[in-house]
Amino acid sequence: MLSIIFHRNVARTIGVASLIFVSCSNFSSNQDPWTSLEPLPLDPAIEAQIDEILPKLSLEQKVGQVIQADNASISAEDVKKYRLGSVLSGGNSAPGPLPYADAESWIEMADAFYMASIDTQGVEIAIPLILGIDAVHGHANLEGAIVFPHNIGLGATNNPDLIKEIARITAHELTVSGHDWTFAPTLAVPQDLRWGRSY
């Protein structure tokens, strides 16, 4: 008796799996493949500038350009020595002992990193670094800045004008603190609701 029940369950499972496979196969075949996307056209002026700069960089500089260090673990001297391409102000890594700092402290740090990155001592050419930060819902590491709800909450408002205004305010606060780049907006598709950005 158990053998018959087992075989029926196996047969049902195979049948359901076959239906799912056929459904998924048909679904994916109706989708436009990513390969149909065309890359953006190259800008000849930018390409010429790249062709001029690359031969002037040492191997060490080229390696440094693809490294992003966290500002809490490096100094301006490190930026110059290793010719870093970017510095991340990661979570809770503001200048100083606190997880946030005032605009003056941020600018002092940003300027020190920038000046170190453009120092041409010992190299033919220097490339300015990019200072990045996680400001997905406001500049939480800037004293006095506005921190907004996370993107999932903002999306739930269904108000693109509000979200645009929040982005404008965040961009202003990042500029005031010397940052060039934020890792935002984010489109998160969590597979596990325990992940912090799923709320």
Task: Give the positions of each predicted feature.
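Bacterial N-terminal signal peptides that target proteins for export
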Residues: 2-14
